[in-house]
Amino acid sequence: MAHPEQQYLDLLAQTLERGDRRVDRTGVGTLSLFGAMLRFDLSDGQVPILTTKRVYWKTAVKEMLWFLTGGTNIRPLLQENVRIWSDWPLAAYRRESGEEISQAAFEQRILEDEAFAARWGELGPVYGRQWRRWLGPDGREHDQIAALIETLRTNPSSRRMLFHAWNVAEVGQMALPPCHMVYQYHVTSDGRLNALLYQRSVDLLLGAPFNFVGAAALQLMIAQQAGLVPGDLVWVGGDTHLYLNHLDQAREQTGRAPRDWPRMRLLRQADGIDDYRIEDFAVEGYDPHPAIAAEVAV
């Protein structure tokens, strides 16, 4: 049987070989394929933390936990040493202030100055806001995550068990419109929780590996809260692309052989979806190839 990571390596290779060369929003340019699907079996505890390069899984899980708080400001992320969202507010600050501040100096100001963080660390109504506090036309806020878990507990055969972040009325206010847009869930007759994640836009080298980990961690948490066990994680990509400054790195990664996937487990039964912490996650048997450095396109 082929290693499950081979699906991802094959997608990298296909994008390198057949990707449509496009000029994109960032100005970097991409090789793009439209429509991709990967399927990962989480039932034995294995999770899609890539082994052909080191993936900083704790960073991905911390980001997912931040989403679940409903957060929209980078300050709590920086307090957890997570810097993956800094580029967008930094670019906005440089553009609006004219100050050529370094990323390190900008992040330090966010950490030390609450007023500065409130003004310049804000990302707008991004993922967490939509997941936990979607604003309806009547002014009421809707908690999609709480509603999902309640439905999983009370009506697990429902075909309406999903949440998403593409709020048309607020997309223009977001620092970055949602890439991993829709999460849908399905319960089998033997109590397995399957998940499907749809991404409209996929940075295949840098973004997708984090999205795999975040979605798997979320599936473990939701399964525990609903009294289920994890099943399949199905990942679907829309515009699936490699940035032109990532091609050498992608070629390097496709030349590496996958190693055994690690296992992820929760160390305790949390009282609710809001009670999980990074310390609740254990990853065992992770032995990856070295990290592959690449620049984020903003």
UniProtKB/Swiss-Prot annotation:
Alphabetical GO biological process terms: dTMP biosynthetic process; dTTP biosynthetic process; methylation
Subcellular location: Cytoplasm
Active site: 179
Signal peptide: none
CDD domains in alphabetical order: TS_Pyrimidine_HMase
One Pfam family here: Thymidylat_synt
Keyword Amino-acid biosynthesis: no
Cross-referenced PANTHER family: THYMIDYLATE SYNTHASE 1
Family: Belongs to the thymidylate synthase family. Bacterial-type ThyA subfamily.
Record-given protein name: Thymidylate synthase
Native source species: Cereibacter sphaeroides (strain ATCC 17029 / ATH 2.4.9)
Gene: thyA
